[in-house]
């Protein structure tokens, strides 16, 4: 299946997208060193085909954005990288931050929304789901956003279509 033709993506063609922490970690680690997909423990649920699917999926959107909360989680997850590549990774991470658009709202504003039970990062994503498409692996987040008719795509559903 051609990703752009997916019924999951068609309604969101041309919208800006925000990746959850795990998908942003996957994208940035793959662009840094593709071998990390098979060797880095934080990415052990992914295969190289997921990187291709993610890359093709992102072409459907007008832009890629993030939040300070997602960046913090990516940074924390990446702390588990082997010591011998951390300096190079830090440089790569810094370069990526320079080119991605960052959206944020004060934590006090986010903490009042109905999604706070999912945690601050997910509540921030929910806060932005009216004007951005959230691409996530997180079932509780995607189900909560879907129930509120907000813009979300569960990457696992795309994987299933991709394999057909």
Residue ranges and their predicted role:
Residues 1-46:
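Metal-dependent nucleic-acid phosphoesterase active-site entry motif
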Residues 1-14, 111-114, 118, 130-133, ...:
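Acidic, PIN/NYN-like endoribonuclease modules and their adjacent C-terminal/linker elements
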Residues 19, 65-66, 135-136:
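Short beta-strand scaffold positions
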Residues 20, 122, 138:
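Acidic active-site catalytic centers that drive phospho-/nucleotidyl reactions
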Residues 23-24, 70, 125, 140-141:
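Alpha-helix capping/helix-boundary segments
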Residues 27-31, 75-79, 143-148:
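A short acidic (Asp/Glu
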Residues 49-118, 123:
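PIN-domain endoribonuclease scaffold, especially VapC-family toxins
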Residues 122-130:
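A conserved donor-nucleotide-binding helix/loop in the catalytic core
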């Amino acid at each position: 299946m051609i990703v752009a033709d997916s019924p999951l993506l068609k309604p969101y063609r041309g919208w800006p997208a925000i990746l959850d922490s795990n998908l942003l970690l996957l994208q940035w680690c793959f662009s840094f060193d593709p071998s990390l997909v098979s060797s880095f423990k934080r990415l052990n649920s992914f295969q190289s085909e997921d990187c291709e699917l993610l890359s093709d999926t992102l072409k459907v959107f007008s832009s890629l954005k993030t939040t300070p909360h997602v960046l913090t989680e990516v940074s924390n997850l990446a702390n588990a990288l082997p010591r011998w590549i951390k300096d190079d990774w830090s440089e790569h991470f810094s370069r990526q931050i320079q080119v991605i658009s960052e959206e944020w709202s004060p934590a006090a504003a986010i903490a009042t929304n109905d999604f706070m039970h999912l945690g601050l990062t997910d509540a921030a994503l929910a806060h932005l789901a009216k004007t951005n498409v959230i691409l996530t692996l997180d079932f509780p987040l995607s189900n909560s956003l879907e129930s509120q008719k907000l813009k979300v795509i569960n990457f696992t559903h795309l994987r299933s279509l991709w394999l057909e």
